[in-house]
Each structure stands twice: as C-alpha cells, then as structure tokens.
Amino acid sequence: MTEALLGFAGVFVLALLRMPLAFAMGAVGFIGLGLVRGWQPTMANAAQVVYDTGFAYTLSVVPLFILMGNFVARAGLAHELFHAAYAFIGHLRGGLAHATVLACAGFGAICGSSIATAATMTKVAYPPMKKLGYADYLSTGVIAAGGTLGIMIPPSTIMVIYGIVTETNIGKLFAAGVIPGLMCAGLLMCGVAWIIWRDPRSGPAGERIGWPERRAALKQIWGVVLLVVIVLGGIYGGVFTATEGAGIGASGAFFFALARGALTMKALYEVLVESARTTAMLFAILIAASIFSSFVNFTSMPSDLKDGITQLGLPPLAVVGAMLFVYVILGTIMEELTMVLLTLPVFFPVVTALGFDPVWFGVLIVLVVQVGLISPPVGMNMFVMNALLKEVPLSQIFRGSSLFCIPLAVGLVLVLVFPQLALWLPSFMK
C-alpha cells in the first residue's frame, strides 16, 4: 500500500509542476510498476495496454459520439434549441436563463461533453442575455452549470468510459442518467428562480412570442429530437449496442448537417480534425490511467483499503459519502475524466465489495463531477467561459457558478439517499 500512496503523491507533485495529468499518471504508473514488478513485464504491459486501447471495439463508441456532437453543433441546432425554449418561457423573469438550461439539456442529449456544451451555449445564449440586461454572474453561472448536463443526460462520454473501465453495461448507465439528468435540469431552473427572487433586476423578462412563432420554433428541432429518440431508444430497447447506436447517431448527424447545407469541405475537415483531436486526448488519458491502474492493482492498496473499511465497521453509505467528498475536493483542482480514472482503481473495488450497484455508483460519480466542473478554482466550465468572454471578470463567473453548485449538490444527495432515482429505468432493461 505504501508504494501506491507514493505513486498518488508523485502524480499530484507532477501535476503541481504543470505536467499534463495524462503524462503524470503514465510516467508514475510505468516507473512504479517497473520498480515493484520488474522492467521486462512492465514494458510488455505498457505495450499491451496501448494496443488493447487503440484496437478495442467497445472504445469506438467514444469518437463516434464525439463526432455526432460536432456534426450537430456545426448544423447550428444549438441556436434552434435555445430559440424553441425561449419562445415558450422567454417572456418570464429569468426566462432566458431558464431557456438556457433547457437548451443545454437538449444539446447534452446529443453532445455528451460538458465542456463542448458550455462552449457552444456561451456563443448561443450569452449575447441575448447580455442584450436584455442580465447580470453577468447569472448569465455566466447558468451557462456553466447548464453545460454540466452534457455529461449527465445521455449519451455521456464519461459514462461510456466508466462503463468500459469497470465493465458496467453502458446502456444501463445511459438509462440510469435520464431521471437524474432531468432532475438536475429542474433543480437548476429552481436555482434560477431563487436568484431572480433575491435579485429581480438580474434577469429581466423578454418579449412574449405568439403561438405561430412557437409552432415554427418547434418544427425547427424535429431533427434533433428524432436523432435522440432513435439512438437512445434503440440502445434502451436492446435493438442495438451502444457502439452501434453511436455509429447510427454519427451517420444521422452527418446527413442532417449535410441536408441543412452546413457541411462544406472545409467545415467537414474542421469537424473531423476536432473530433480526432478530442479522441486522441481522451485515449492518451485512458492509456495513462490503465498503466497507473496496473501499478495500483499490483500493490496491496485496493485489498488493504477494503479490509480496513470492513474492520472499522463503518456504515456502507457513509463510506460512499466519504468517497464523494474526496471527489468534490479533487474536482476543484483536477480535470474530471483524469480525476475519475485516477481514483476508480481504488474506489470501485471497495464499492462493489460493499454490495452497491456499479450503475448507481457511476451516476453518483457523474453527479459529483458536475459539481467539480463549476467549483472554483479549477472548474473547467468556468475557464472555458472565461476564454470565450474576455470582457466578463472571472470573479463574476466564479460568483454565478458557485451559486449553482447548490442545486447540483442537492441532486447528488437525492440520488445518494434514493438510489431508485437512478436504478428504476435500468430495471426495465434486459
């Protein structure tokens, strides 16, 4: 166990020295495994990990869902989702903020990435809120928080990777994320209402739109609704696997963007390059995490931790609560995927030994990552917005994001205390 603790310390030290966490995990895992196991088997293990990761059929779901999200973003559907939501509730106080949450939920049902959702909705939702006189802390906070729905509402990249690493059914993970995802969207809208109640001037009412315009706005989003229903309905119904669903989704998004005239040769090239770049980054993290996981598993840390918790006689739910607290702390200083992959080799065996459902734990991890994404000082969504909105002080983004941590934390506690919120839908799957 001492070797593993030194390994974790080494990763944190290298991270503080500004080394990318993928390289830090890979280097520490490789050197640590070489010292405790020997260099020849370590070299063989590293080569096998790279080969297995690069050629794993199940992992092809990752680039395909990324490609689907990029095609949909290129087609401009985020604007239409926002306009459709605004058409119905924009005339209320805080209506544009509520519309932003709904648009983020809709875009998240296609995108699967929190950062991409936040970046896209910043371009779509911030200008009209700024024009109407919304307070910067509310407009930036609701976009940053709404962006986190991109990883909660399926399809979700982080759910896919969790499912692959822990060998948990991805379709059941997607089904488990539906109710908590919708609940989080509702809680964020409650957060908007609370902010408007405390500070009515922060979110002025917009113009009321008539029913003909509302019907026209709904007609504009039929394509995205159909795509989501086909992909997720097929996965939930067992018609095809998550990988096949991702392929169908990417193909459908391609033809949809093509039909809308959004795909020139230059645009297609940019979509493919961006998808390849994101995929390469994720695969680098996966390879490094697998090497580090091999090192941790070779030490006695997972078994020692399980034995220690058993001897202490702590309530199982308290143990999971302590793990979630660790994730909250790590989420303020680390990127979400790296944080999850770094801790899963230690936490997951303990959770399964305590008899908890891995699908439920996967949803909890995504929920706690949501909180980390908008928690100062290193919440990734906040810095994405800061990079796009140079005119808005970072302090205002921090202020707004911190307020929306509360609704997301409430959602986390509800799923922790009432597991059926996550497990009810998967119970109907074969």
Question: What function would you assign to each model-found segment?
Answer:
Residues 1-430:
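Alpha-helical transmembrane segments of multi-pass membrane transport proteins
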